């Protein structure tokens, strides 16, 4: 059942893709213990705001693909929670219970919800975005505060953060970043991702990453330029750890490796494609 009962244009082919758990955490940080109804209302309100006749909500199930490549992927998160008190554990269980209830409610209302053990929402989003033309989607809005999803930004794909309340689009890209969209992956590979426990090149933060991009180009240009003659310590670190750029690309390049991540999670690609296609082409 398409989401056309709230005054949207008929035959609407726009798509809202929601980073399910990411959006739920706004209620945890706001200390809202019972948020199922608010969650559903927020998702549907955003669909109305962006004139999206289709809603797909995604949940995280870990990442077999990235763990196989790099066993320490997100290992810092386990450290963060290992000393939880019983009360904190109970609070988190309640939070996840509300999230499960919200997922069930969204599914009952006819929206498509997807979760696969061993697969991250990022990969599902990237795969769907990559197939959007094949699925007949006009415009796509990504709902997440995770800037990793900016790797998917295109003329017809934009992101809204429920945390900052800001949009990231092709038109306002320069307001958010000081490099072109096609250099975002290179920037991430150089600087790393602390939140996901992916190290970059030691000594290279955002400013130095931007300088290297301007001087050499993308990550493969930088890799091929190594060893770079320099007295600077961070360049010497780059020379010694240039292979890190290639590993980071495999870990972070959602567009290139989402399908591989899906396969390694044991999710059936044909079944996934059928679910998405049937939902998007379902009767209104």
List the model feature ranges, each with a label.
Residues 180-183, 190-263:
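Accessory alpha-helical DNA-binding modules that contact the DNA backbone or grooves
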Residues 273-284:
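Long, highly charged low-complexity segments enriched in Glu/Asp and Lys/Arg with interspersed Ser/Thr
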Residues 142:
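Conserved SAM-binding loop
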Residues 2-139, 149-167, 246-247, 253-270:
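Noncatalytic, basic helical substrate-engagement surface that gates or grips nucleic-acid strands
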Residues 155, 174, 202:
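Conserved, surface-exposed functional patches that form binding/active-site neighborhoods
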Residues 122-131, 178-188:
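Short, motif-level signal for alpha-helix interfacial/capping segments enriched in acidic residues
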Residues 167-177:
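Short, charged, surface-exposed secondary-structure boundary motifs
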